[in-house]
Amino acid sequence: MHTDLGPDQKAEVLIEALPWLEEFFGKTIVIKYGGNAMVNDHLKECFAEDMVFLRQVGIHPVVVHGGGPQISQMLKALGIHSEFKGGLRVTTPEAMDVVRMVLTGKVSRELVGLINAHGPLAVGLSGEDAALFSASQRKPIIDGEPTDIGLVGDVVGVDASAVVDLIHAGRIPVVSSVAPNEDDATEVLNVNADSAAAALASALGAHKLVILTDVDGLYADWPDKNSLVGRIGVEDLRDLLPELESGMRPKMEACVRAIDGGVQQAHIIDGRKPHSILNEIFTTAGVGTMVEPGEGMELRSSYDL
């Protein structure tokens, strides 16, 4: 790997990471893998390296992923019509078969393979395995009316025992975001990966939830680039939620859910930047937006970087 850093600068980078390596040793961190990091080959490899790094320094990474772009691509290739209502994919039984196939048979397998190129570490499983997730079918309010969007649900229950077993065995769990219907375990629902990651982080008692996005973080006053938030208390974030763009809102709602569920910190970071996870976790300034219990907000423009 090419770097322009001299020996002294390399040493400074390592020393800066030392207190964070000590603080997070033995802790569980749930990472929601998504956005451009899932479709760019170089970023995929960087993500896999980050997961291996975390594991090798004594941290327990757990990955939860979706696969919206890959699902859309496969539906199109198979000639299956797919529509969205209120920003949510209408998931017919035919489309659900494709969702399961892509998430568990393609996205998961690829990521497991990239991680396992560094050693026999990753194990893929879905929300169906060992009843990891259970979900209730969702009928969102769209244009003031409850709307049927098919086999789409919200995670309402987590049995994390299978994931805990993998962590204790030194593995890196890679979890696909599908879940059996709580009312009919033979029916499988498509669930939002952000909220699934938050639910799993809470159930595991994780120290952190990290969500990869295609933006730098949360902006308090979008599109003002100087309003990028470095740290925000969950109470202030709650007040901001109604004002957020539709794409960012579910991610920030997941952060709120995680903090409310006992997770100490939740992060929104830019997955388009190589190794952004390591930069957020192991540097003092970080690179994205961190959500914590309590109140208050700091903009990154106020940091002495």
Swiss-Prot record:
Entry's localization field: Cytoplasm
Pathway terms, separated by semicolons: Amino-acid biosynthesis; L-arginine biosynthesis; N(2)-acetyl-L-ornithine from L-glutamate: step 2/4
GO MF annotation terms: acetylglutamate kinase activity; ATP binding
Domain of life: Bacteria
Entry's Gene Ontology cellular component terms: cytoplasm
Reactions performed catalytically: N-acetyl-L-glutamate + ATP = N-acetyl-L-glutamyl 5-phosphate + ADP
Keywords: Amino-acid biosynthesis, Arginine biosynthesis, ATP-binding, Cytoplasm, Kinase, Nucleotide-binding, Transferase
Pfam families for the chain: AA_kinase (PF00696)
Residues where substrate binds: G67, G68, R89, N190
The protein's enzyme class: transferase
Residue ranges that the Swiss-Prot or TrEMBL entry lists as coiled coil: none
GO BP of this protein: arginine biosynthetic process via ornithine; L-arginine biosynthetic process
Chain positions of site Transition state stabilizer: K32, K251
Transmembrane residue ranges: none
EC number(s) on file: 2.7.2.8
Job description of the protein: Catalyzes the ATP-dependent phosphorylation of N-acetyl-L-glutamate.
The family this protein is said to belong to: Belongs to the acetylglutamate kinase family. ArgB subfamily.
NCBIfam families: argB
Name the UniProt record assigns to this protein: Acetylglutamate kinase
